């Protein structure tokens, strides 16, 4: 018989220790991976609720199981809040991840073998935008576009490729691009050749929700996002549209269920509903503005210290530090910073001579440190520490000093106070 007093600590101490160790790691490390963030205790409360027990195949009011009257309320709240947050007329909150949301869009708009124009992974795109190792690159004819010598998206090249190859779908969005995307220009190009415009705004959804980054929803036929990253919700995906096309909406819903998934994760959808409500609060806009301010402050210090930033700056939450020409790989930089309790990820940069497993760059983002309460002063100080480590990546005394400074700073700014 189940009892509410049951707990992991007593029953499975080995697992409990791993959970506790990860909790301590998050508190004592500075998180700079651009796709990571700290979700709220309210979201975690929803995810740990008895909603996890409920199967609810279908959609609100149209379920294949009984007993769904309350989970219908939960999902409807999430849908309506997502629509309000992004100015959409359609929202599907069931995708288990951003990649599965993207898969549903491909399934809706394309047939295998159709031509797609997507951002080159090496220039800042995403696996699901046409990488050969991903379903998108295996099932569709991918034409990649990229960035110019200034590190900005080359819209002239994009238009030339679109006219030449006539893709059925164009993809906007990225995983490692620090600029502002001109969604309107992309829609113009798509309309010129009669293509769908699909935007994956996973990385900037929180910035978009707060009005500090242009909203793609009015321009694209379909938009997807994750619900974590800058949005700071549970790990999951969403699909949005303002196309006012009921036939498209039905096809998108069918592509999620039954096309790609079975039962939705109702406890996660509840977490999404909470996160969307939090994102509608005025303080969320203040937070997102600070995310960008902190990123710009970090870029200034990197440039002062002689480091190259891809595109020369940032207009969002992330930056790519280009290490080409330095006696340091992205993998080595990642490891050295990790030893100092600073978590980043190695990342390929444009024209990278090294493999994706080694790389010549690191990607840095500010959503998590800003969530902890860091302002410009802390962001600048932290960046100097990062440069100290990168300048002395094999000097254990420098790494030890920086680790001590990191621990002191983390103690001043706990993740969950």
From Swiss-Prot:
The protein's annotated pathway: One-carbon metabolism; tetrahydrofolate interconversion; Amino-acid biosynthesis; glycine biosynthesis; glycine from L-serine: step 1/1
Localization in the cell: Cytoplasm
Keyword Cytoplasm: yes
Residue stretches in coiled coil: none
EC number from the UniProt entry: 2.1.2.1
Catalytic activity: (6R)-5,10-methylene-5,6,7,8-tetrahydrofolate + glycine + H2O = (6S)-5,6,7,8-tetrahydrofolate + L-serine
Domain of life: Bacteria
Main location: cytoplasm
Cofactor(s) in the UniProt record: pyridoxal 5'-phosphate
Disulfide bonds: none
One of the record's GO molecular function terms: pyridoxal phosphate binding
Residue positions where N6-(pyridoxal phosphate)lysine is found in the record: 229
Annotated residues for binding of (6S)-5,6,7,8-tetrahydrofolate: 121, 125-127, 355-357
Any one annotated GO CC term: cytosol
InterPro entries: PyrdxlP-dep_Trfase, PyrdxlP-dep_Trfase_major, PyrdxlP-dep_Trfase_small, Ser_HO-MeTrfase, Ser_HO-MeTrfase-like, Ser_HO-MeTrfase_PLP_BS, SHMT-like_dom
Annotated keywords: Amino-acid biosynthesis, Cytoplasm, One-carbon metabolism, Pyridoxal phosphate, Transferase
Keyword Amino-acid biosynthesis carried by entry: yes
Gene3D superfamilies: Aspartate Aminotransferase, domain 1 (3.90.1150.10), Type I PLP-dependent aspartate aminotransferase-like (Major domain) (3.40.640.10)
BP GO annotations: glycine biosynthetic process from serine; tetrahydrofolate interconversion
Record site feature (Plays an important role in substrate specificity), residues: 228
Protein role: Catalyzes the reversible interconversion of serine and glycine with tetrahydrofolate (THF) serving as the one-carbon carrier. This reaction serves as the major source of one-carbon groups required for the biosynthesis of purines, thymidylate, methionine, and other important biomolecules. Also exhibits THF-independent aldolase activity toward beta-hydroxyamino acids, producing glycine and aldehydes, via a retro-aldol mechanism.
Assembly mode: Homodimer.
PANTHER family, per database record: SERINE HYDROXYMETHYLTRANSFERASE
Stated family: Belongs to the SHMT family.
Protein name as it appears in the record: Serine hydroxymethyltransferase
Organism: Shewanella amazonensis (strain ATCC BAA-1098 / SB2B)
